[in-house]
């Protein structure tokens, strides 16, 4: 089973699995309401050209978007950088449904195209959690770590009671499936195959892979949430996940600092069309939200 989101890394991972490993996978997509139309089209392109089946598990998209609305309203009443991640809490049930598909298909092997350079310690760092540089996975798991994380999140939530809404069960159950359930036959393909951005972009062009019209980067363009939360981080903290990603590339020796600075100067430009789509989708007023974010006092 290969998870595919329509993003760059999962699409390239599928290419490797079929063409290099010579496997015949089934792909799985969890549509929680924030997979963009562009992402869906890229999933269709990859699966069609590689001749693989795509199983789509769709959540109650209306419910998921209403949950985002409730939590975003709570966040805007008391902005906290450590709570930005609650806006993406709804996608964690991905981990629940992949186990269902494994049982139904009789396939135990689960391969993910997760890029090890995309780890972002700062997101939980804004809650007061120090980075674990020995962490083996992009997404941390384990009961003690998660209990501490949820306790710090609860403290932040107490500053805006709007967080205590009907989305709580969805959020907590998603975290349970992501962090507490035992995963078996679960591997990240880029732990074994070198991740090379230039080669990935070149390969995806062979599939007529579609780019977003409002940015030059190929990262996160199938994710409807990324443009908005990166706008928050850039406005308030002065950097985004693009900065941490490029910093990790420097540490790996993939690019130099001058190249990284040139890239993030472009990648950190606000993606207003995508932000507008996101806020419309969750039923929020675009101008009102942007004005509220812009009024937040920067921390730098």
Where are these regions (language model features)?
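Nucleotide-activated chemistry modules centered on ATP-dependent adenylation/adenylyltransferase
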Residues: 1, 16-300
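Hydrophobic positions on the alpha1 helix immediately C-terminal to the Walker A/P-loop
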Residues: 12-13
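Short, glycine-rich nucleotide/cofactor-binding loops
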Residues: 2-9
């Amino acid at each position: 089973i290969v998870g595919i989101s329509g993003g760059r890394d999962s699409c390239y991972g599928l290419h490797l699995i079929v063409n290099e490993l010579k496997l015949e996978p089934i792909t799985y997509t969890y549509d929680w309401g924030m997979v963009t139309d562009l992402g869906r089209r890229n999933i269709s392109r990859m699966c069609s050209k590689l001749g693989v089946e795509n199983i789509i598990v769709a959540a109650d998209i209306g419910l998921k978007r209403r949950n985002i609305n409730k939590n975003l309203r709570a966040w805007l009443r008391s902005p906290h950088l450590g709570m930005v991640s609650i806006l993406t809490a709804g996608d964690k049930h991905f981990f629940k449904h992949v186990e269902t598909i494994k049982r139904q298909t009789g396939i135990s092997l689960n391969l993910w195209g997760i890029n090890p350079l995309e780890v972002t310690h700062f997101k939980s760092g804004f809650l007061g959690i120090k980075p674990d540089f020995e962490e083996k996975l992009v997404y941390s798991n384990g009961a003690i770590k998660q209990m501490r994380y949820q306790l710090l999140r609860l403290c932040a939530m107490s500053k805006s009671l709007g967080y205590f809404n009907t989305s709580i069960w969805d959020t907590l159950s998603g975290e349970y499936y992501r962090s507490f359930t035992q995963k078996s036959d679960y591997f990240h393909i880029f732990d074994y195959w070198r991740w090379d951005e230039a080669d990935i972009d070149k390969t995806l062009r062979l599939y007529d892979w579609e780019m977003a019209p409002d940015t030059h980067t190929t990262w996160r363009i199938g994710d409807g949430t990324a443009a908005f939360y990166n706008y928050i981080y850039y406005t308030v903290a002065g950097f985004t996940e693009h900065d941490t990603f490029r910093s990790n590339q420097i540490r790996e020796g993939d690019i130099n600092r001058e190249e990284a600075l040139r890239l993030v100067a472009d990648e950190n430009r606000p993606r207003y069309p995508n932000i507008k789509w996101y806020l419309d989708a969750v039923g929020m007023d675009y101008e009102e939200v942007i004005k509220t974010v812009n009024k937040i006092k920067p921390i730098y």
